[in-house]
């Protein structure tokens, strides 16, 4: 007699797949996020040092 084959459910059944969604948000690479963070940190340090002289 032949064995009956049982099929398993597909993996991730019922879970949302994020890469399938179409979003209109700004897409930024990880390198861009790190660069933007470093720019903001440097800008804040400059304001902390020079700011009291400018703004009193």
UniProtKB/Swiss-Prot annotation:
Residue intervals annotated with topology Cytoplasmic: 1-29
Biological source species: Pyrococcus abyssi (strain GE5 / Orsay)
Subunit structure, as described in the record: Component of the protein translocase complex. Heterotrimer consisting of alpha (SecY), beta (SecG) and gamma (SecE) subunits. Can form oligomers of the heterotrimer.
Protein name: Preprotein translocase subunit SecG
Entry's transmembrane regions: 30-49
Tagged with keyword Membrane: yes
Membrane topology: Single-pass membrane protein
Domain of life where this protein originates: Archaea
Gene, per the UniProt record: secG
Extracellular compartment spans: 50-56
